[in-house]
């Protein structure tokens, strides 16, 4: 089951000020990257269901995903990377594992993925209830358990799931573990910091994906659609820009126009 209106609702919340995008530690922070520096990365989030396998079925909701993604983007703002929600999919796991601790190997986890929701032009993030580690990154998909727990460190994030998700995305962007306790790539801690070398590496890796776009390029496309009076299509692109945690004229315009398109759509007579 997909949530087609969920992404536009995210943009509307951002425009109203109800969606709070904070830094990893829950505090507003300055950002050395400008709007034009930002790279936008699509992620499809999968909430896996398995009524006969409690170890698999996640209990996360769309409201949880709004919060989690906001905190993830607070972490990744230090690298000028923004993960936008391509879609949120709630779906039955393909091969539910009856083990009480959940699947623990590569085949067991990858076997949970329904084939109809896979695609090659984005990152895929799957949430389950239990597995032997907090999270794991495969070339095909990332898995995170919604019961993750971490060791607190000074200045660390205030919630495990956004940190584990951000850590695994770090692996997807080419980063190895680095056992500095306050670093995002340290194992099992709440740390979120990246050094300059890691920031450069993740940005270089992201640029290598054909499906990663610069904020300026996406804004140009959205504006062209808006001028052509293709408001729903424009709103889809504006919604990706509207949640960038940055005080910038372009972000404010994206919020305004995404919200405008949603209001126009809701006021249109039913077809």
Model-derived regions: residue spans:
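Bacterial N-terminal signal peptides
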Residues: 11-21
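Sec/Tat-exported extracytoplasmic proteins
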Residues: 72-80, 168-169, 173-177, 189, ...
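Propeptide-to-catalytic entry region of secreted or membrane-anchored zinc metalloproteases
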Residues: 27-120, 131, 238, 245-246
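The catalytic-center signature of Zn2+-dependent metalloproteases
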Residues: 31-33, 152-218
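N-terminal secretory signal peptides that target proteins for export/translocation
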Residues: 1-7
């Amino acid at each position: 089951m997909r949530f087609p209106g969920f992404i536009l609702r995210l943009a509307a919340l951002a425009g109203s000020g109800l969606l709070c995008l904070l830094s990893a530690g829950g505090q507003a922070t300055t950002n050395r990257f400008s709007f034009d520096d930002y790279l936008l990365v699509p992620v499809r989030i999968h909430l896996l269901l398995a009524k006969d396998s409690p170890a698999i079925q996640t209990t996360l909701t769309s409201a949880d995903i709004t919060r989690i993604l906001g905190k993830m983007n607070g972490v990744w703002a230090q690298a000028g990377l923004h993960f936008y929600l391509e879609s949120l999919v709630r779906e039955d796991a393909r091969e539910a594992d009856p083990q009480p601790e959940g699947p623990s190997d590569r085949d067991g986890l990858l076997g949970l993925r329904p084939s109809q929701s896979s695609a090659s032009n984005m990152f895929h993030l799957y949430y389950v209830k239990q597995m032997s580690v907090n999270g794991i990154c495969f070339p095909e998909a990332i898995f995170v358990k919604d019961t993750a727990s971490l060791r607190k460190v000074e200045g660390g994030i205030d919630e495990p799931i956004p940190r584990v998700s951000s850590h695994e995305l770090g692996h997807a962007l080419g980063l190895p573990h680095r056992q500095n306790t306050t670093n995002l790539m340290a194992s099992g801690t709440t740390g979120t910091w990246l050094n300059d070398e890691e920031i450069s590496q993740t940005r270089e890796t992201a640029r290598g994906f054909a499906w990663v776009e610069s904020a300026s390029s996406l804004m140009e496309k959205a504006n062209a659609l808006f001028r052509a009076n293709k408001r729903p299509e424009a709103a889809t692109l504006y919604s990706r820009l509207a949640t960038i945690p940055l005080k910038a004229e372009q972000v404010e315009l994206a919020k305004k126009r995404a919200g405008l398109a949603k209001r126009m759509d809701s006021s249109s007579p039913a077809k």
